[in-house]
Amino acid sequence: MDRSLGWQGNSVPEDRTEAGIKRFLEDTTDDGELSKFVKDFSGNESCHPPEAKTWASRPQVPEPRPQAPDLYDDDLEFRPPSWPQSSDNQQYFCAPAPLSPSARPRSPWGKLDPYDSSEDDKEYVGFATLPNQVHRKSVKKGFDFTLMVAGESGLGKSTLVNSLFLTDLYRDRKLLGAEERIMQTVEITKHAVDIEEKGVRLRLTIVDTPGFGDAVNNTECWKPVAEYIDQQFEQYFRDESGLNRKNIQDNRVHCCLYFISPFGHGLRPLDVEFMKALHQRVNIVPILAKADTLTPPEVDRKKRKIREEIEHFGIKIYQFPDCDSDEDEDFKLQDQALKESIPFAVIGSNTVVEARGRRVRGRLYPWGIVEVENPGHCDFVKLRTMLVRTHMQDLKDVTRETHYENYRAQCIQSMTRLVVKERNRNKLTRESGTDLPIPAVPPGTDPETEKLIREKDEELRRMQEMLHKIQKQMKETY
């Protein structure tokens, strides 16, 4: 009986079938061979079961596909193909669909995280979130700022500080009488307070200098202030050079508001001497105090005169950093206005008065009200903007990178010179031996040991004489 009767009309040679099966079994991982094998036998009707012959002729009625649990988009390429079966017993093989965005948890960084980004942002790495990490760590740690106020008594230093930070730092202050002021010397007082605003903590330290400029003879009255600044640098240098550097408290003075009296025709000799003595140690911001005692034209003339004298005497006050070319135009205009306002003409007040139906901080006069936070009356808002809102970090950076580094370099140079000098002295002492006394022979020594000691003594004396002769010849030669 012919074996090909089972293959009616579409018989395939037996050797071809066996060769294809053998090739398929030899490499089951080759997709190309699998496709070729299926293609060779796809047209053979006898390869399918009898009920499969009518599958293509039946009308295909779409059936609802069961919903599967969601899966990420990256797993789509691993879904196995679904092979069609008869409509009587039709089955589907498919991987779960992707997880819907509403069902999966949200990233703490929002759109900056590729987990929540769109398909176009899948190549996003994520290091752009570093500013967020630094911000979170900095807010958790808090910030330090030390502000020094210097100037004569009665110029409104304490009042201005309270107005700047909306707090009362001098509630325990005791006002001295006339006799006590005569005997008063320059002192350094510290007022520390923790301020919190919108979750940001600031450890503010105010350094006051009561008694400065109040004496009849103010010669070198700036020395206690300079010594205090150097002491803070020295303490920070020691902490930085120690073993435990994790929790170093920064008490370095970051800014000094120097108050200039509105009475006179510019800077006084004491003002010039103070600023020249401290401009290499701290950021100096000149303040024209009690600006409400001057008319607007007088304020302009006073500012211009002070700026000319500062430049004439070579005083280096705090310099505002230059704006970058890509900065916003509004920021550039604001920065230019701050630079032109030096020295800041300010008014301080702790009293709240009512002006035009509003309660403001100001001073009440018979002719009207002077508002502290009115830009048309004084430069208080500009000073607060510069000191707190825009340039506080730059003041700290200049202190760390310029003033403290200068002090640190001087300390290292002094230590190096001392070490080199000590080494040279020890080396000269060892070579000359003049400072080392010749030891005496201990009693009870045997004759041989005594003889060796005396020979060494004679040798040392000859070497010393030769060294003295060489040194004498060198001096005569040079």
From Swiss-Prot:
Gene3D superfamilies: P-loop containing nucleotide triphosphate hydrolases. GTP binds at residues 151-158, 185, 290-298, 348, 363. InterPro entries: G_SEPTIN_dom, P-loop_NTPase, Septin. It is found in: Cytoplasm; Cell projection, Cilium, Flagellum; Cytoplasmic vesicle, Secretory vesicle; Cell projection, Axon. SUPFAM superfamilies: P-loop containing nucleoside triphosphate hydrolases. Its main location: cytoplasm. GO terms for biological process: cell division; flagellated sperm motility; hematopoietic stem cell homeostasis; neuron migration; spermatid differentiation. Residues 95-108 have a biased composition (Low complexity). Residues 446-478 form a coiled coil. One of its GO terms (cellular component) is perikaryon. The modification Phosphothreonine is found at T434. PROSITE patterns: G_SEPTIN. One of its GO terms (molecular function) is GTP binding. The modification Phosphoserine is found at S117, S118, S325, S432. Residues 208-211 are annotated as: G3 motif. Residues 141-414 form the Septin-type G domain. Residues 289-292 are annotated as: G4 motif. Residues 151-158 are annotated as: G1 motif. Residues 38-115, 425-448 are annotated as: Disordered. The keyword Phosphoprotein applies. Ubiquitinated by AREL1. Septins polymerize into heterooligomeric protein complexes that form filaments, and can associate with cellular membranes, actin filaments and microtubules. GTPase activity is required for filament formation. Interacts with SEPTIN8. Component of a septin core octameric complex consisting of SEPTIN12, SEPTIN7, SEPTIN6 and SEPTIN2 or SEPTIN4 in the order 12-7-6-2-2-6-7-12 or 12-7-6-4-4-6-7-12. Interacts with SEPTIN14 (via C-terminus). Interacts with DYRK1A. Interacts with SLC6A3/DAT and SNCA/alpha-synuclein. Interacts with STX1A; in the striatum. Filament-forming cytoskeletal GTPase. Pro-apoptotic protein involved in LGR5-positive intestinal stem cell and Paneth cell expansion in the intestines, via its interaction with XIAP. May also play a role in the regulation of cell fate in the intestine. Positive regulator of apoptosis involved in hematopoietic stem cell homeostasis; via its interaction with XIAP. Negative regulator of repair and hair follicle regeneration in response to injury, due to inhibition of hair follicle stem cell proliferation, potentially via its interaction with XIAP. Belongs to the TRAFAC class TrmE-Era-EngA-EngB-Septin-like GTPase superfamily. Septin GTPase family. This is Septin-4. It comes from Pongo abelii (Sumatran orangutan). The gene is SEPTIN4.
